[in-house]
Regions:
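PLP-dependent amino-acid enzyme catalytic core
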Residues: 1-336
Length: 336
């Protein structure tokens, strides 16, 4: 939002799951300045919001109507492959840093553990590997919504399960869009992938063939951690290393501990702990205030870590966007 605000020739609409973000995340979006910006909460979870947006992208009538106005839709999340391109870079950066520090011999493999729900960030690591980076295993770290863990272990993707709201909300996803891309690269068959996706849409489940699963497991491993595991990891990392991590990174740390080999492993940290200050405080054994902003101040006082100014000042900004849509209304909003 901030990157595209008030850019000529670009209009921005953001759809996010109502009650599926922290207070800080919500205010980052709802207070965003810019004449070309519109933000909508969607009643439901991330899957409801993303599925609604993907339906709009696939709607030929919407595309035709917008074409008349000289408008073409694009996406800033990983619906758009361009979202993955900058993520590829830090796999190379991390490897080069390790090599320069002597932690790994040039050309020797390094494993990466990635907290993910939509499979985008970890897919960027797969692309880095395909480009020649010596990536060993890509370890997919899930929270209690562990549909990816089950798939990577068994080859069966079954979204017909309870949806859990966790302390790592950006991973609260049951339909992982980017997995479809991996299936295409591994199977080499658009017909197979289309069949699996149609089966998922119709039944909520699909199973890949043994050859496809074997190829996936050559590059990927998986594990999951629940909220209690993550909280324990936040405290352990701070007490042991004085490293303050967020709830998503904590999931990856816990999974990394269970999936270690002799190869060096990099844990990808994907969010600031100050976006989830109440949960981080609670994990550290401190009673958290009701407000995220009071919790942010308490987290700074208790750890010495400084919250980004852009987050500290959010409660002083005007809330510009308050509309809550049903998923079926996303199409109408896109045509406004």
């Amino acid at each position: 939002l901030a990157g595209y605000a008030d850019l000529d020739g670009i209009e921005i609409e953001v759809f996010y799951p109502n009650d599926g973000t922290s207070e800080i995340q919500h205010l980052q979006m709802a207070t965003q300045k810019g004449e070309n910006v519109q933000v909508y909460a969607v009643q439901g979870n991330f899957d409801d919001a993303q599925t609604g947006v993907k339906k709009v992208f696939a709607d030929a009538d919407v595309a035709a109507e917008l074409e008349k106005r000289g408008i073409r839709l694009s996406s800033a999340n990983s619906i758009n492959w361009g979202r993955l391109v900058p993520q590829i870079v830090y796999y190379f950066y991390a490897y080069f840093r390790l090599a320069e520090q002597g932690a790994v011999e040039w050309g020797k493999p390094v494993d990466f553990c990635v907290p993910t729900g939509n499979f985008g960030d970890i897919l960027a690591g797969y692309y880095a590997k395909q480009m020649g980076l010596p990536v060993g295993r890509l370890v997919c770290a899930s929270n209690k919504n562990n549909v990816l863990t089950d798939f990577l272990r068994t080859g069966t993707y079954d979204a017909r399960r309870t949806f859990y709201k966790t302390t790592s909300p950006s991973m609260d996803i049951l339909i992982s869009s980017n997995l479809e891309r991996l299936l295409y690269h591994v199977s080499g068959s658009s017909e197979k992938v289309a069949g699996w996706m149609q089966e998922l849409s119709a039944t909520g489940k699909y199973t890949v063939d043994a050859e496809t699963l074997a190829k996936i497991q050559q590059s990927f491993a998986a594990g999951y951690a629940d909220d209690a595991d993550g909280a324990a990891e936040i405290k352990a990392r701070f007490d042991g290393d004085h490293y303050l991590c967020d709830t998503h990174t904590a999931v990856a740390f816990r999974v990394a501990e269970t999936r270690r080999t002799d190869a060096p492993m990099v844990v990808l940290s994907t969010a600031s702990p100050f976006k989830f200050p109440r949960d981080v405080l609670t994990a550290l054994g401190v009673e958290a205030p009701a407000s995220d902003f009071a919790a942010m101040a308490a987290l700074t006082a208790g750890t010495g870590a400084e919250a980004p100014a852009s987050l500290r000042e959010l409660d002083k900004l005007e809330v510009r966007f308050k509309t809550v849509l049903q998923p079926a209304d996303i199409r109408t909003a896109a045509l406004r």
